[in-house]
Amino acid sequence: MDVTFLTKNVQINGTQFKILLQNGQGECALIALANVLLISPAHARYAQEISRLVRGKETVTLNELVQTLADMGVQNPNGTDVDKQQLLQILPQLYSGLNINPEFNGSFEDGVEMSIFRLYNVGIVHGWIIDGDNDPNSYEHVSKYSYMGAQKVLVQSYEIQKNNAQFENSEQIQSDAPYLKSFLARSATQLTEYGLTHLREILVERSYAVLFRNDHFCTLYKNNGELFTLVTDPTYRNRKDINWQSLKSVNGSQDSYYTGNFIPTSLERTETTATGQNESYISNPFSDQNTGHVTSNQVNSGASGVQQIEDDEELARRLQEQEDMRAANNMQNGYANNGRNHQRERFERPEKNSKKNKFLPFNGSNKEKKRDKLKKNCVIM
């Protein structure tokens, strides 16, 4: 049976769109990419096929989505040299698990995975960045690494300490490892305060991108200088008032839900007034429409409503904190588990050269760039 995705009708800044929702796989790169193409005005000209695919449908299959994106890829001005069959092979990986490698200076290690986003002219960003302004010492030790590179150093450091292993750069490994371990522990959500600021700077107002965070991918949008992620959880499919979640904090403690027009909302369902003109969480006893006397029951009901909203928001924060804890535990345990001999052998073997797969345009010169310079001049349109 083919994998399927539910669709949802949303209104964003007064315009109607249909988006795709995640399934049990979670927030995957395929859905994040597809939704940018579906709702971004900058991509409307080249995204007519995917818009036709979802129009009038309650569900879309993985095969339909991949076939449509592949057709769009070869027709895209950036895809003149693209092999459709090879594109059909890699696009499903955006659903099953995309192997990307964020670098702690704000960029990504280049490769075929990055070329997918270039093909569709969709930016991919992350905020897992070390703060070079307030912690220059840590920046010197951390910014030159990617996540996979950091894991390799931690494994090698473990081998040096436990098994007296020797590497060509053992001194450098032992010097950098404590800073890397500390940084990973302090950024369990794969997002830092400095990274949040960086994201606000590089995204143009009312622009879209794909955000990598917590080993997941989501559709990111900038509105009035603030960042929002598209809500694709099928739990909220019937909630027309929940379309966005703000991205104001690294742990979700300050994040809240918004309508498609960026009006704050709540997990609690809103109730329509008798006139059908207004929606509110609590009826206003001082409204001109309330011609009766205000009773103690009304006041208590209002207070209960406020408490329910706070409880719902606290639940959302706790769920986010649990996810952050899970990610932190995975990272803390990962480097030790990888210290087994077969992992050591894998790290010591020459890495596979991603240039060999030439089915997509790939600029391998990224390896030669200056890693100690944060890409603040890279603006996502």
UniProtKB/Swiss-Prot annotation:
Regions of compositional bias (Basic residues) in chain numbering: 372-381
Alphabetically ordered keywords of this record: Cytoplasm, Nucleus
Major localization listed first in the record, in broad terms: cytoplasm
Organism domain of life: Eukaryota
Stretch list, region Disordered: 331-381
Family matches, as Pfam families: MINDY_DUB
Biased composition (Basic and acidic residues): 342-354
Subcellular localization: Cytoplasm; Nucleus
Coiled coil (residue ranges): none
GO molecular function: cysteine-type carboxypeptidase activity; cysteine-type deubiquitinase activity; K48-linked deubiquitinase activity
UniProt feature, compositional bias: Polar residues: 331-340
GO CC list: cell periphery; cytoplasm; nucleus; plasma membrane
Additional detail: Present with 7620 molecules/cell in log phase SD medium.
Name of the protein in question: Uncharacterized protein YGL082W
Native organism: Saccharomyces cerevisiae (strain ATCC 204508 / S288c)
